[in-house]
Amino acid sequence: MKSRTTILGLSAAIFTVLSFYSVSPSVAADVPPLEERAAWFRHDRFGLFVHWGVYSTIGRGEWVQDTGKIPLAEYIKLYPKFNPEDFDAAEWVALAKSAGQKYIVITTKHHDGFCMFDSKLSDYTIMHTPFGRDICKELADECRKQGLKLGFYYSIMDWHHPDYTPVRPWEKGKRSTKGADFARYCKYMKGQVRELMSNYGPIVALWFDGGWEHKSDEDKKAFKDIIAVARQLQPNILVNDRAGIGGDYKTPEQRIPATGIVDKEGRPAMWEACMTMTTGHGSFAPTAWWGYDAHEKIFKPTEELLHKLIDITSKGGNFLLNVGPEPSGKIRPKETERLEAVGRWMDKYSESIYGTTASPFRLLPFFGRVTQKGKRLYVHIFDWPKDGKLVLPGLESMPAKAAVLGRPDAKLGMKRNNRDGIDEVLLMLPKEASDPIASVIALDFDTRPVVKPLVIKPAKDGKLKLPAAFVEIRAKHGQRAKPVSKDGRTCVGNWSNPNDVAVWCFTMPKAGSYRVELDARAASEAVVGQRVEISVGKSKLVAKIA
């Protein structure tokens, strides 16, 4: 009888439990191929995102001009008072370097249109503030001095420029757009990109944003022309996907793609997940702001940030972790502390991140992730098994050598098993974890290891178990759900966003009727009565948690 592969999706209203397609403009013939330009990107894996601008003086996030419905005439009164005297480029770069971050991307101009660089095309810049210094120039010089790479974020959207349209919905009828000419604005944008690509030395990435309001063929042509200028001046540059015409790499925001990202041919694509340390417990909650939010109460803990870095790397992506400096120019202590803590882990285990590729395992029966570097696998263990046993299912070759990184004297045992026709390697671990957040086991093979995909299917008694360790969390912007471990058991935790869906792919020998049991736990009674929807294909089951 033919087996059928099924996808089960589980979503909750509020439920808390523990080179893709690219349109390339005509550019100079000496632009290197993508694989050559992207070598650093695939190696470095970890970067620092900086959202900083005049909006920081209000302390309610980078969108405050819009969310606070501040008229332009009022908003522009901020920049003559912007004087970040505590800004120290050397301090910023040193912090990123100590965290193990290999590159920095800074907002040269965000949606409010204020320029953090010396642009000769506008007076609305950092040079016309009491501070009067080119932030981007100082950062570029310091990155070169300390050996980090630099990328520039640039917003297509501009709430200040008179030629940019459309205006914000709440401004309609209040702010005139008479005489506005978007084509003229594009010339302004091209001029600023030319400045950014000409005056700051080697720039590794051009990080566009805010292009979603302009999708016409005419607009796309203008954006292609702008990118062509960037490539002509910086032949090795990578351009992201946010100008609406494709790009060199994808940029999922505030989420981790469940299984990485592939191109149209099914090949691994380049991608970079950008995320904040903020959690949305501040201004205009539940949005987690990128720019400084003085009211944010909760920041992601170091453990979560490290798990995200490892998870993203194991799926073939890069992690661009954001900070939102204070108006003084200082990076907040809570962000600094977390970066320093991440750096202490990277000091010991960075070889399991830099230069690695995605995990060969589709599923793992434990709370952890795997990265690969040629004939070596790095097994990251987030929750050390109490019985000291760790199974790697589908691994068809026996490691020639195994070692606990950071503990060269630790003893490891290995045994080869075959369970239900599937090869597996059993690791017998030391009694104690080598790291409280993520221990790393290095497995060396004589040849590149081959892994047979693990297939979820019913046991001999017909029962199908879908453990949280095998879940794919498919999320949109603003992912909250994440794998967590409680008392040695992996769960889907922090499930407060109904757009986060838990998915299992499994194979059934035949169709039938099944009784569904869901194990839900929470730290409070708030979960009781919440709606849960379970879907298999077109069939749906809706229930409430009792």
Predicted regions and their residues:
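Positively charged n-region of N-terminal signal peptides that target proteins for export
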Residues: 1-5, 96
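Intrinsically disordered/low-complexity terminal segments and short unstructured peptides
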Residues: 4-5, 15, 489
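Hydrophobic residues within membrane-embedded alpha helices
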Residues: 7-10, 441
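Mature catalytic domains of secreted/periplasmic carbohydrate-active enzymes
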Residues: 29-513, 520-546
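Bacterial N-terminal signal peptides
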Residues: 9-22
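Sec/Tat signal peptide C-region and signal peptidase I cleavage site
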Residues: 23-28
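Intrinsically disordered, low-complexity segments enriched in glycine/proline and serine/threonine
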Residues: 5-7, 536
